[in-house]
From Swiss-Prot:
The keyword Magnesium does not apply. The keyword Ribosomal protein applies. HAMAP family: Ribosomal_bL35. This is Large ribosomal subunit protein bL35. It comes from Sinorhizobium fredii (strain NBRC 101917 / NGR234). GO terms for molecular function: structural constituent of ribosome. Pfam families: Ribosomal_L35p.
Length: 67
């Protein structure tokens, strides 16, 4: 069976840390910021670590060879 390719869209959205955790940009920051709380806007800056089950799914299905 041929080697599974890394999904190009996942390459751009996720990074795998040295310890195997998956980092991604926080959701909900595209528009509609006027009705968001200041705390939400602050917390959604930068990247966040995905929950362990979600991270495992991302790596298994979209990033089989890591990054």
């Amino acid at each position: 069976m041929p080697k599974m390719k890394t999904k190009s869209s996942a390459k751009k959205r996720f990074k795998v840390t040295a310890t195997g955790k998956v980092r991604a940009a926080a959701a909900g920051k595209r528009h509609g910021m006027i009705k968001r709380t200041n705390k939400f806007i602050r917390d959604a800056r930068g990247t966040m670590v995905l929950a362990e089950p979600d991270g495992k799914k991302v790596v298994k299905n979209y990033l089989p060879n890591g990054l």
